[in-house]
Amino acid sequence: MSETATWQPSASIPNLLKRAAIMTEIRRFFADRGVLEVETPCMSQATVTDIHLFPFETRFVGPGHSQGMNLYLMTSPEYHMKRLLVAGCGPVFQLCRSFRNEEMGRHHNPEFTMLEWYRPHYDMYRLMNEVDDLLQQVLECQPAESLSYQQVFQRHLEIDPLSADKTQLREAAAKLDLSNIADTEEDRDTLLQLLFTMGVEPHIGKEKPTFVYHFPASQASLAQISTEDHRVAERFEVYFKGIELANGFHELTDAREQQQRFEQDNRKRAARGLPQQPIDNNLLEALKVGMPDCSGVALGVDRLVMLALGAESLAEVIAFTVDRA
């Protein structure tokens, strides 16, 4: 297709037909397992507090809201789906549009398709097995391997991420020629993320998907802290062929702890000169009622389709990327 013909889809029609077949296959996977498909709002008055996520903001003006109501496009359907879990819906999944005001490139588009699902009474490992089942079915790949966050750092960077101090992390960064970034960074988790992205990700999941689990407790996000090792969180990510595919948690159910984490995020945002975000009080109220013990995962569908089709970029599997929207 001509580079100037921006009216045309970025993906070919044959690829869009294959994408549709994969979407059908995903829905069949969950229907066969008795998981309910749900739909939740794309906009909310609250948003994520994570310092690494940047939501789109808009303003609603209508009857009863002459002064306007701030709304955020959802970066993930997580909060609404957890409220459904509290309401008693049982296991649920959703295929939806999500939005992040961040980068655009081979593996990123500001608007993308998310597959998210929650399994009451599943621990992290059982959900990892189900993710593996889905990947094998859609990608026809080998069964995944599982490595702890500590193991991948020790294997590829020869440091222990759970005990290394910032000086040791900067020394590891220097070996990767990242001193220009690391030497001025004071946040330990940001240093760890830099090392993980540049020193670990390129080496894992080459032949088969790789689960990395037990991230540091300081990176728990909405996951529980392990009862066996308080240094780590019950959180995992999945990588295949250089691409992060999914991020999952043994979900935090304690409302007070969740509020403290939201508030801590906002303090970090303020320290970095970022806007503090409105906390989702509806989620906190739901957690106070009681969410069943569960695990959940979010998976990037566009990236999954890209891998299934052997494509080189998301543009080959999305009808219209943002520059053609």
Curated annotation (Swiss-Prot):
EC id: 6.3.2.-
Keyword Ligase: yes
GO biological process: lysyl-tRNA aminoacylation
Binding site for ATP: R100, N101, E102, N109, E244, L245, G300
Annotated binding of substrate, by residue: S76, P77, E78, Y118, E251
Transmembrane segments: none
GO annotation, cellular component aspect: cytosol
Disulfide bonds: none
Keyword terms of this UniProt record: ATP-binding, Ligase, Nucleotide-binding
GO molecular function, one term: acid-ammonia (or amide) ligase activity
Reactions the enzyme catalyzes: D-beta-lysine + L-lysyl-[protein] + ATP = N(6)-((3R)-3,6-diaminohexanoyl)-L-lysyl-[protein] + AMP + diphosphate + H(+)
UniProt cross-references to InterPro entries, sorted A to Z: Aa-tRNA-synt_II, aa-tRNA-synth_II, aa-tRNA-synth_II/BPL/LPL, EpmA, Lys-tRNA-synth_II_C
Purpose: With EpmB is involved in the beta-lysylation step of the post-translational modification of translation elongation factor P (EF-P). Catalyzes the ATP-dependent activation of (R)-beta-lysine produced by EpmB, forming a lysyl-adenylate, from which the beta-lysyl moiety is then transferred to the epsilon-amino group of a conserved specific lysine residue in EF-P.
Family indicated by similarity: Belongs to the class-II aminoacyl-tRNA synthetase family. EpmA subfamily.
Assembly information from the UniProt record: Homodimer.
Protein name: Elongation factor P--(R)-beta-lysine ligase
The species this protein was found in: Citrobacter koseri (strain ATCC BAA-895 / CDC 4225-83 / SGSC4696)
Organismal lineage: Bacteria, Pseudomonadati, Pseudomonadota, Gammaproteobacteria, Enterobacterales
